[in-house]
Amino acid sequence: MEHVPGKKPEWLKIRLSSGASFASTKRLLDRHSLHTVCRSAMCPNLQECWSRGTATFLLLGTVCTRNCRFCAVGKASNPPAPDPREPEKIALAVHSMQLKHTVLTSVTRDDLPDGGAEYWVATIRAIRTLNPFVTIECLIPDFEGNERAMDLVMAELPEILNHNIETVPSLYTKVRPQANYATSLRLLQRAKEMHGLTTKSGMMVGMGETAEEVAISLGDLLLHGCDMVTIGQYLQPSALHLPVERYITPEEFEQYRSFAEGAGFRHVQSGPFVRSSYHAEALTKKTETVCSPI
């Protein structure tokens, strides 16, 4: 059954839950004045993840230099300078939360000479100094294709190197006009071929793509050395953002999961609420395909 935009279908109604872990996570993040993509991007899984004591840390502030039409993060051509104490603050938060796996991401900072790569390096090193047994996933921007900036981060050998293609190439002009599909694929290939990293990428669906286009993009990811993939429903953050073209059914997400698994991905998460870092810790522990609960 096809669901066009309008009232959200039942499977997209979030079951809110919170408790001691949720409150503790919020207090800790507020105390250290830390940013998370959970809040900045209005992630639908915030309640669940914080209740499990997990969060995805957002580096380089909360203002992005790109104008992607799907994203709720603030935008400006000249954001405030990064906080030099941010790496230390994040490392302390990882220690306080007793995390075994941490996910780092950042806004895109085209205003900085290296796109913020040195801050990435400083944060990874600060975390490992204070938390030597923590595994790290880095969800990085494209650094405008700057290979030196990419290499700075990749040379730190995070356990997972994540970079999202976000959508199919035919929608790039409409969805993320300042990005380049081929650049994203080359980044993933570089992480695999030059640095031997475990690689991951993600897509949103429901923005006007076809199932055939999704299948082709999954094939492109595999051809460029991508090991893991996440597929989730695009949800419009506000009336100013790109509207949802269609709500993808749970059955369709299962079909995407089955196709991606059969195509050769090591890990697959596919479901309405799946986001790039959703249950990221599970991917460091399991060898089978991971499916998101609906």
UniProtKB/Swiss-Prot annotation:
Pathway where this protein functions:
Protein modification; protein lipoylation via endogenous pathway; protein N(6)-(lipoyl)lysine from octanoyl-[acyl-carrier-protein]: step 2/2
Q: What class of enzyme is it?
A: transferase
Q: Which is one Pfam family of this protein?
A: Radical_SAM
Cysteine disulfide partners in this protein: none
Example GO molecular function term? Answer: lipoate synthase activity
GO CC field? cytoplasm
What is the name listed in the Swiss-Prot or TrEMBL entry for this protein?
Answer: Lipoyl synthase
* Source organism of this protein record: Pelodictyon phaeoclathratiforme (strain DSM 5477 / BU-1)
Gene name in the database record? lipA
